[in-house]
């Protein structure tokens, strides 16, 4: 839907769109993509290329209880709030919101590359919450405890989390 070249899931699934793949898991396409990347970076090992990536602090997946009947309405409300915040030039923890991607919930991107995600679980009576900080583990926890958790706590339909950071 976004025209992304590649997509990756925590479960280990990966997807490549044209011109590399056909939109589904394909180990040979993944191997060819890695070999192509190494060919474009002569003299660098795969570990050298990995070290060049920025460090990110990503939370585990946190899932507050929310009934199947209520979860999509809750997510619609949260999407609307974040869209309004983004449209008004809003910020989260002092960082300007640069985008609110609303495919299957909302992923709010901040100016430093950090983000927060809220969506409905597709197969459980839960929401799915993930946060990522490009600054530190403490900042990752702050994105959850000072932004997402209080926003969801305003809704009586949202219950206890299965785990928290």
Residue spans of the language-model regions?
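Phosphate-binding and adjacent anionic-ligand microenvironments
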Residues: 1-165
């Amino acid at each position: 839907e976004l025209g992304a070249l590649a997509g990756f899931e925590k479960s280990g699934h990966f997807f490549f769109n044209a011109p590399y793949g056909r939109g589904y898991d394909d180990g040979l396409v993944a191997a060819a993509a890695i070999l192509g990347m190494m060919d474009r970076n002569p003299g660098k090992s795969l570990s050298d290329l990995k070290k060049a990536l920025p460090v990110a602090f990503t939370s585990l997946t946190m899932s507050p209880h929310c009934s199947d009947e209520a979860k999509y309405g809750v997510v619609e409300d949260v999407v609307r709030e974040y869209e309004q915040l983004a449209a008004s030039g809003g910020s989260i923890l002092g960082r300007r919101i640069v985008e609110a991607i609303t495919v299957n919930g909302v992923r709010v991107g901040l100016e430093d590359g950090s983000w927060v995600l809220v969506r409905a679980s597709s197969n459980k009576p839960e929401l799915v919450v993930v946060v990522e900080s490009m600054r530190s583990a403490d900042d990752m926890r702050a994105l959850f405890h000072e932004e997402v958790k209080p926003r969801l706590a305003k809704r009586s339909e949202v219950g206890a989390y299965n785990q928290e950071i």
